[in-house]
Amino acid sequence: MNLYRLELKRVCKTRMTAILLAIALVLAVVMAYLPVTFIGWTELDASGNKVSYTGLKAIRKRQEQQVFGTITPDVMQEALEAYQRVYRQYDASSINDIPVEVFYKELARYQPLVNNAKEAFADPKTGMAPGVMGLTAEDMQNFYSQLPKRLESVIWLEQSGKPGYEQAQAIAQKKFDAVQKPFTYSFGVSPDAMDYQTLLSLLLTLLCAVIAAPVFASDAQTGAQDIQLCTKNGGLRLAAAKLAAAFSITGAAYLLCGVVWILVTNALFGWESTQTSVQWLFSVTSLLPYTVGQMEWVMLVANFLIFFAEVAFVLMASVWAKNNLTALSVALISVVAPLIVYMVVPGSFGEWLSTLIPAGGIGLSNALLYKMIGFDFLYAGGYAFFQADVLLASAPIKIVLLVGLAAWGYLRKTRVA
């Protein structure tokens, strides 16, 4: 315990660690606030002039006129009728033909509902969504019964022809059956906000990788490790203390910043929106059985598992590195490696590789969030595996394996010494 406290104090007292932790906390607040600036609202004032709002003011304006609560087929029909009435009034063929102030006054509250209805009734062979005037009141009454059919067509469009396609279809339908219907909705947290949670996870991983990289390598660079390895407690006990201290500091920083992001985001957008079904944010056939609020916490915990696996890899690299530069280079490359593999290596091999390397699931377009809301499957031996499930199931295995390799590598140095 004394070694652990000393190592914790040593790492925390370095100027670089303090700076990086401060940057991480600032990033958490900034990443929560930026999506707020994307929200807009336009209306006419008492004189008939257009007045536009952005940010918090726009959010409050939208919330004053929103549709909220359980979205029943009757509410869906009400939304369609409002849209079609305005479309006829302005002889519109698309939303661009509607005056901006009319859109915000008459239609903005119904937009998520109508957009999801268009997606639900998209052509099963082409995926093309119908226009507003192509939908009927009967369609709205059948909205929820249409969703399994839409899911089946989406899986067919994206996965047909692959070995194990039928199993992928069955997995998707089983997951979607667990989604609570009818959906609930309240304007607030946006898809952009969830994107920024993913970006924050990537940035925090980069910062914490920089903190963890020198934990062992700095002693190797200065020669202090040669002395430590010859002491009574310089073997496994010291290695365990260093590993525990590094995990404690980076883990606490990640969780603190993640919680700050959630609290600030919900305070800005409104806590009511945490009850919104995630299907309104991403896709009407998203397989996740969560509300937005639940999704925020699920993503924090899920990304934390992957983050821990990456930190374990960085610490293993630090054990074998002879100087800080080597350890830092390996750490930074390993964080972005899944994104590079995802973009460069084609086919099933690239998908498996980007999933199984330590930081798999951390990144941008390859991030865990998009695997959870999408329909990405991995195939092997005629079997299909939901990629998000593989990412989460493999993370604890990676952690145990990499921590074990780090300890083994340090013990090998002890024997040599």
Residue ranges and their predicted role:
Residues 219-226:
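Hydrophobic transmembrane alpha-helix segments characteristic of membrane transport
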Residues 21-25, 325-338:
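Central hydrophobic cores of alpha-helical transmembrane segments
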Residues 38-135:
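N-terminal, intrinsically disordered, polar/charged segments of Gram-positive cell-envelope systems
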Residues 17-20, 306-314, 371-417:
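Alpha-helical transmembrane segments of multi-pass membrane transporters/translocases
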